[in-house]
């Protein structure tokens, strides 16, 4: 046994053969694609909101239908279904639902049909995110599992940029063709699963070091780590079914799940909930009111090249936000150490301050009305920090729970330990979605109140949109 040390994340002291590095690259690429494709349809739908519903219909209904079914999947699935996870069936089910949902949006013009299609794609996205987070826990040693999860988080961040860019490119084709073309994207996921993703059993004997161990004298050592799940044929009972046998009839009861989830509430769920509640209140309720006069080329040469009308401000804030979310969600995959466990609430605290500062800037303003350049730079910095906080909260919460050791009471039972780890990472997934849902309800009165505050001080830009 190699000695445990305090610096858990380093693998530099190990000489990893090229074959193992190639496996890690394939694992990272696979999980990056899972995160990218699973989330990109969500972004495409939000980006296409103006084109999907009549002008008289509140665009918030798109945001609601795009998040509520995903929340149902994240809340219900881990608690209701029992037994081992059949990842192949899950992945094919999500692929078909996503593609079908986008086809319904593309082929039908009625608002009701389009909302049904958006709901199908949303449910699939929520279940898909849950599935890939759980899939990451089936890899061992912990450094391998963390590698996959880090790249999955990076892929979800990239989806924001990719989705907005894709819709920008295809929106000229119209909803029927543009959204119809996006319905083929979900098929990348099963192709990745079968043709690119290494099996968890391929890491059974590798020289990749586990998180928590290091030795300057070990080079190319072969460590017998048994992954918590192997091939699909080796799995026990399926979700919702029970098979006979001393090893295969393990399933967590509802009381077991309640016991497991209690310590996760304050450690992971509340920080995730609040960071997303504040974040999406900013995006949907505050950012639309952060408007300034169009910069003059004489005073602000660079800004005048970017901002041509007051309608350009909101897309600019969203571009800044999506870019910084991608960078921060990629922090672990590019080698930045994760936050210490006791600092996991920090991003949500900072996000709350950012919300207050941006609301103050919108309603009262930090600077004089003719100093729009300073105001724009300040908002740029605050929204960049907003995206960083949101991305760090997401990737660090799921990374930390992915790396947790099994409960001592179940460590001797590999099957039970596997199911507990899958449930724990799946059970906290609803926290971010519920934060977004509550934010969508809070954003409408927030936007109206800030616009009224602006008009009271003579700033009428929000009335001109």
State each model region's role:
Residues 72-109:
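Conserved MFS/SLC helix-loop-helix module at the cytosolic interface between two early adjacent transmembrane helices
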Residues 44-47, 118-141, 164, 290, ...:
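Intracellular juxtamembrane helix-capping segments at the cytosolic ends
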Residues 82-95, 173, 334-351:
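Cytoplasmic membrane-interface "Motif A"-like loop-to-helix N-cap segments
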Residues 1-41:
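Cytosolic juxtamembrane N-terminal segment immediately preceding the first transmembrane helix
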Residues 63, 69, 140-193, 318-324, ...:
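Glycine-rich segments within core transmembrane alpha-helices of 12-TM secondary carriers
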Residues 4-14, 200-269, 273:
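Long, low-complexity inter-transmembrane loops of multi-pass membrane transporters
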Residues 24, 28, 41-47, 53-57, ...:
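Membrane-interfacial loop- and helix-cap regions that link adjacent transmembrane helices
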Residues 86-91, 168-186, 420, 445-465:
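A membrane-interface helix-boundary motif in multi-pass transporters
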